[in-house]
Amino acid sequence: MKRLVGVLMILGLMLTSWGLLGSPQTAIAASLSPLSFNPSPVLAEQQFRNAMDDKLATDFGKKIDLNNTNVRAFMQYPGMYPTLARMILKNAPFESVEDVLKMPGLTDTQKEILKNNFSNFVVSPPLDALVEGGDRFNNGIYR
């Protein structure tokens, strides 16, 4: 009985594999006649622009944008990192550079540091690419 079951299983396996592998699959090629291939004319070429390229062409690349820059950019100015930088990020957006002096909880020393660095600051509208998520606080660059 075991031998009969074994023979039937082998026979069934051979018939199944012959059925799957034995019949060739026909390929259907696409017709590339001139009537079916109609290229559409290009009416106008659109140039794609990255919003960050436009932003870097402004003062953003040279100065600290108070509404868009991350906390690590403040490290280059003494007295700004980390306390003042964190306060600026938490209280942004600002309408003008002078608005940073209106932040609550500033000491006189911190106000002097901010006033001395006004020439290093610029204010522009916040861009979603720069302010979404936690990238302003931790942009993932560790040196």
Swiss-Prot record:
Proregion positions: 30-44
An example Gene Ontology biological process: photosynthesis
Signal peptide positions on this chain: 1-29
Pfam families: PsbU
Keyword list, A-Z: Electron transport, Membrane, Photosynthesis, Photosystem II, Signal, Thylakoid, Transport
Gene3D superfamilies: Photosystem II 12 kDa extrinsic protein (1.10.150.320)
Disulfide bonds: none
Family assignment from sequence similarity: Belongs to the PsbU family.
NCBIfam families linked to this entry: PRK02515.1 (NF002708)
Protein purpose: One of the extrinsic, lumenal subunits of photosystem II (PSII). PSII is a light-driven water plastoquinone oxidoreductase, using light energy to abstract electrons from H(2)O, generating a proton gradient subsequently used for ATP formation. The extrinsic proteins stabilize the structure of photosystem II oxygen-evolving complex (OEC), the ion environment of oxygen evolution and protect the OEC against heat-induced inactivation.
Name of the featured protein: Photosystem II extrinsic protein U
Organism (species): Leptolyngbya laminosa
